[in-house]
A protein has these predicted regions:
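Conserved active-site tyrosine of GNAT-family acetyltransferases
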Residues: 131
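Conserved beta-strand-loop-alpha-helix junction that forms the acyl-donor binding cleft
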Residues: 118-128
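Conserved GNAT acetyl-CoA-binding A-motif
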Residues: 110-119
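Glycine-rich acyl-CoA binding loop
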Residues: 94-97
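GNAT-family acyltransferases
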Residues: 1-81, 86-89, 102-106, 110, ...
């Protein structure tokens, strides 16, 4: 299963691939986050797409992964949160804006999903710009990392 954009293929990693990502991750916080994602996949096999690491692969350069994202589980209330990151060298090309728009629209087309949310570090202006460009607005709440956003769609 994959989501296709103009320039990328977006797809969830298999459990074995996620284990490799965890083994190769040097940042302790990311290693912990990826481990929790894998545990979510293993605990919720029928809903693993809502816990998996998703890669962002360039169409015109097969095998080149420019970043990744995840959904942070699907709540009983129909709310799913997204998180994302780009590799150095691939920023400022619009890849994340393209991916966030596509995954948000895809998520909202899935059974049980009523709302897509995100949270960013208060100082991560680039990430906030991605959210604003793709139809998110601040919902007035603060999370552990910073301001929270909710998808409102394009006007």
């Amino acid at each position: 299963m994959r989501v296709e954009t103009e320039r990328m293929y977006l797809y969830p990693l298999r459990d074995e691939e996620m284990r490799l990502v965890i083994e190769n991750e040097s940042d302790p916080e990311m290693k912990q986050a990826y481990t929790e994602m894998l545990e979510g996949c293993l605990s919720n096999p029928d809903k693993r797409i809502w816990y998996a690491i998703w890669d962002m692969e360039l169409k015109d350069e097969p095998g080149i992964i420019v970043g990744d994202f995840c959904f942070k589980g699907l709540g009983d209330d129909g709310v799913v949160e997204i998180g994302y990151g780009l590799k150095e060298g691939y920023r400022h090309y619009g890849y994340m804006t393209e991916a966030v728009k596509a995954i948000t629209e895809w998520a909202l087309s899935q059974d049980g999903v009523k709302q897509v949310e995100a949270e960013t570090d208060a100082e991560n202006i680039a990430s906030q710009k991605v959210l604003f460009r793709t139809g998110f607005i601040r919902n007035g709440k603060m999370g552990e990392e910073g301001p929270r956003f909710v998808y409102e769609g394009r006007r």
